Amino acid sequence: MKTKAKMSPKKKIVIAVGAVVVVLTAALLFVSNYLVNYAIGRSGDGGDREVALEVEASPDSVEAIIETNRAQYSADIDAFAATHPGENVTLTAADGLTLHGVRYANAETAATHRWAIVLHGYRGDHTGVLNLAMPYYEAGYQVIAPDLRACGDSDGDYVGMGWLDREDILRWIDFILADDPQAEIVVHGISMGAATTMMTAGEDTPENVKVFIEDCGYTSVWDVFSSEL
């Protein structure tokens, strides 16, 4: 009658350690995949973020004045959107994605060749920069408000956080120059759009790009995700 060989303590330890490593690796992969999808996935849970703009204030406080001005400005933006629907435009990114934007053509001042590309923030779309598009338009600029990749009506599975988007903005610059070779262009972004602006500024842009405006961009992706996650 055969007897089963006893497993040595060393072998038991190796098997136990191996099992722990497998479990920890699987858990790490699961958590990592969840966090990536949450933070930059197009349909991730991170897309349900809402920024509270309201503040409680007494009638005589500075906050009350700010809220009054904000309400008026919001009404002005709504009026602009209602009377200036813009033109839907698209282009193809270097990796084949179809990118969408809205062009606000200003026929009365087209001869000035002044253009502005206005860039929205994290999880936003072109409607989030109407507050930028409106004053540029009223100042006589032609305005392009892109939906960054994986945002709005643009293709893409993952938010670019500015790095992928920088090449897309170069395409939007070329889009403008194909229409107006004499264009003088401002690139103006907020939040993630500001990071996109700065990353675009590091590229070899045409001399037609005269100004980059970075409004409240993040210091690093690590800082952003540390806050978001």
Model feature map: region roles:
Residues 24-91:
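An N-terminal hydrophobic leader/cap segment in hydrolases
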Residues 94-105:
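A short loop-to-beta-strand scaffold at the N-terminal edge of the catalytic core in hydrolase folds
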Residues 112-121:
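Short beta-strand element of the alpha/beta-hydrolase
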Residues 122-135, 148:
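The serine-hydrolase catalytic nucleophile loop
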Residues 135-155:
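Conserved alpha/beta-hydrolase
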Residues 159-180:
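Alpha/beta-hydrolase active-site loop
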Residues 180-191:
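Alpha/beta-hydrolase fold nucleophile elbow
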Residues 199-229:
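Hydrolase active-site cap/lid region
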